[in-house]
Amino acid sequence: MASEDPSVSGVSGRYATALFELARDEKSIDAVTADLDKFSAMLAGSPDLVRLVRSPVFASEVQGKALAAVLDKAGITGISANFLKVLAANRRLFVVADVIRAYRALVAKFKGEATADVTVAEKLSDKNLEALKAALKSVTGKDVALNINVDPAIIGGLVVKLGSRMVDSSLRTKLNSIKHAMKEAG
């Protein structure tokens, strides 16, 4: 399955595929997804956790013990916790964000959903998220799972990547277009 989908290739794809197949066999796809979403949110909110995950300075034992404490406090148990501990033991914790992204892609494919990567300048409200999902569903004919990335550098608007298609309606791109047009005219 991983070889068919370019979004789940490489080391992260192999780990994501293994986790997905285990979760599917144990009928716990939704529980694992919820745990990974929780861990992903923890990463987004904690620079210290990001350092622990990404730094090669920490030995795998140190990473494993610290990770076990974090997972215990967050209430992440079972398949998800064991999987994250395996990543730490195998010195692959630095790819956890890519593994989570690839896992989500596998789950979306399994459920017949499309996945869109959306970059926005600031966090979207729930109302705007639902409107975006509805607009993308009307285009694809499928339910669309969103991977939201907040990047203030785009200034405003959004960038949507859905499969091989990309729509860049960011203010940064529009300003760059105006800048280039003015250079050509002047």
Swiss-Prot record:
It is a peripheral membrane protein. SUPFAM superfamilies: N-terminal domain of the delta subunit of the F1F0-ATP synthase (SSF47928). One of its GO terms (molecular function) is proton-transporting ATP synthase activity, rotational mechanism. GO terms for cellular component: plasma membrane; proton-transporting ATP synthase complex. InterPro entries: ATP_synth_OSCP/delta_N_sf, ATPase_OSCP/d_CS, ATPase_OSCP/dsu. It comes from the Bacteria. Pfam families: OSCP. Keywords: ATP synthesis, Cell inner membrane, Cell membrane, CF(1), Hydrogen ion transport, Ion transport, Membrane, Transport. Its main location: membrane. It is found in: Cell inner membrane. NCBIfam families: ATP_synt_delta, PRK05758.3-2. PANTHER family: ATP SYNTHASE DELTA CHAIN. F-type ATPases have 2 components, F(1) - the catalytic core - and F(0) - the membrane proton channel. F(1) has five subunits: alpha(3), beta(3), gamma(1), delta(1), epsilon(1). CF(0) has four main subunits: a(1), b(1), b'(1) and c(10-14). The alpha and beta chains form an alternating ring which encloses part of the gamma chain. F(1) is attached to F(0) by a central stalk formed by the gamma and epsilon chains, while a peripheral stalk is formed by the delta, b and b' chains. F(1)F(0) ATP synthase produces ATP from ADP in the presence of a proton or sodium gradient. F-type ATPases consist of two structural domains, F(1) containing the extramembraneous catalytic core and F(0) containing the membrane proton channel, linked together by a central stalk and a peripheral stalk. During catalysis, ATP synthesis in the catalytic domain of F(1) is coupled via a rotary mechanism of the central stalk subunits to proton translocation. This protein is part of the stalk that links CF(0) to CF(1). It either transmits conformational changes from CF(0) to CF(1) or is implicated in proton conduction. Belongs to the ATPase delta chain family. This is ATP synthase subunit delta.
